C-alpha cells in the first residue's frame, strides 16, 4: 500500500535521480510498483535493476553484494543520488544493509530510511498486538531451524516462512502452538489465515506468521 510509505521515504525518492531495485527490472519489483503509486514521476527517473540470487551460499551472496555495490557507486561517481527500494524496513533481513556497508566502507555516504516492518503491518491487519506488558517478542527466520527458538518465552514472528511452510506447520502442531498468517500483506494478493488448519502447504514469498502463547 503506497499510503504506508513514510513521508521521508517519499521525499527521498523524489529527490533522487536514480532508483535502484532488487530485481531483474522495474516491472518485476514490487517495491517499485508500490512507490509508483505515490511518486508520480517515477517513470522519468533512471532505474537500476540489481537482482540478487535466491541462495544461502555466502560466497555467491558476497560476490553479488560487491557487484551490486559497484553498479551503485558508478552512479554516485556520476554525481547522481541513488534510492535503493526495499519492502518493509531495511534493518530487518534486507539485502540493502550488506550493500550499504560496502558503499560506506568505500568512502561514500549512505543512510537508512526506516519503514514499517512487515510484522507490524501484519499485526495491525490482524487487529492484535505483538506483545502486551511484560511479554517477550522474538523475530525468527523460519527458513532456518526454528524448533529451539519456539521454546523461548513470549510471542514469535516467523518470517521467510513460504519455502518451508509445510514443515513450519508441522513443528507448530508438534509444539501445540497456534498461529495466524498473512500472505502478501498490504498487496492485491493479500490472504489472511486465522489458524494453522486454514494455511496452505505452500505460500508466496512474502509470508509472515504470528505465534502467540
For every predicted segment, state its role.
Residues 1-3, 7-108, 194-199, 207-208, ...:
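Class I S-adenosyl-L-methionine
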Amino acid at each position: 500500500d503506497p499510503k504506508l510509505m513514510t513521508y521521508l521515504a517519499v521525499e527521498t525518492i523524489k529527490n533522487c535521480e536514480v532508483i535502484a531495485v532488487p530485481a531483474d527490472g522495474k516491472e518485476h519489483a514490487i517495491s517499485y510498483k508500490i512507490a509508483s503509486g505515490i511518486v508520480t514521476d517515477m517513470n522519468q527517473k533512471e532505474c537500476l535493476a540489481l537482482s540478487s540470487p535466491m541462495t544461502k551460499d555466502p560466497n555467491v551472496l558476497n560476490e553479488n553484494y560487491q557487484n551490486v555495490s559497484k553498479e551503485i557507486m558508478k552512479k554516485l561517481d556520476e554525481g547522481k543520488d541513488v534510492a535503493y527500494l526495499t519492502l518493509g524496513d531495511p534493518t530487518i533481513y534486507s539485502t540493502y544493509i550488506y550493500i550499504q556497508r560496502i558503499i560506506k566502507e568505500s568512502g561514500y555516504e549512505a543512510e537508512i530510511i526506516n519503514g514499517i516492518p512487515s510484522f507490524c503491518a501484519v499485526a495491525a491487519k490482524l487487529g492484535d498486538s505483538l506483545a502486551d506488558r511484560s511479554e517477550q517478542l522474538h523475530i525468527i527466520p523460519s527458513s532456518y531451524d526454528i524448533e529451539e527458538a519456539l521454546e523461548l518465552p513470549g510471542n514469535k514472528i516467523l518470517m521467510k516462512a513460504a519455502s518451508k511452510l509445510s514443515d513450519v506447520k508441522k513443528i507448530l502442531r508438534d509444539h501445540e502452538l497456534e498461529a495466524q498468517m498473512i500472505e502478501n500483506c498490504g498487496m492485491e494478493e493479500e490472504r489472511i489465515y486465522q489458524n494453522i488448519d486454514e494455511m496452505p502447504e505452500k505460500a508466496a514469498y512474502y509470508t509472515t506468521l504470528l505465534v502467540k502463547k
